[in-house]
Amino acid sequence: MFNEIKDFAAPELDVYARTSEVQLLRYYEPEPGIFIAESPKVIERALNAGYQPISFLVEHKDLEGGAQEILKQYPDVPVYTAEYELLVKLTGFALTRGMLCAMRRNPLPSVEEICRNASRIAVLENVVNPTNIGAIFRSAAALHMLSLIHISEPTRLRC
């Protein structure tokens, strides 16, 4: 179902416009929260990995473009849509691929579960800059890493 954005203050748009990363992370506490995936390619990978969509935010022109196949698979998930300029105003940044998706986070596996069957693991310790994390994830994928462990508080990790 497509919903034309008419009211920027609509509460269903909060996750895209007025909720910080920390608030998204804790959205359903004590259960895992929400994350925002950007671009059809990233959204498709997340869906294939078992993450559940909550809603989509799609630029008008992409309703018939790259988003179309994904949206067909989830006809009951709300789709909020507007022209590019309105989406930039709503989100505060330029959508590079015309599509965002709010998704439920899955519970994180334990370090033991990750290490059990993985032969190639990359470990990030105290890396917090999103640009650096993105570059490292892309490099890990290029090097065929099977898992990536991100440790923001090394003293909390116990194997």
Language-model features: where?
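A glycine-rich helix N-cap at a beta->alpha junction
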Residues: 75-88
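Boundary-proximal intrinsically disordered activation/regulatory segments immediately upstream
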Residues: 1-60
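Acidic/glycine-rich phosphate/pyrophosphate-binding loops and surrounding catalytic core
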Residues: 94, 98-118, 122
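Alpha-helix capping/helix-boundary segments
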Residues: 41-43, 62-63, 85-87, 156
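Glycine- and other small-residue-rich loops at beta-strand/loop junctions that grip anionic moieties
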Residues: 5, 35, 125-126, 152
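Amphipathic alpha-helical repeat scaffolds
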Residues: 39, 128-136
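Single conserved hydrophobic/aromatic residue that forms the stacking wall/gate
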Residues: 149-159
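Short, aromatic/basic amphipathic alpha-helical patches
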Residues: 65-76
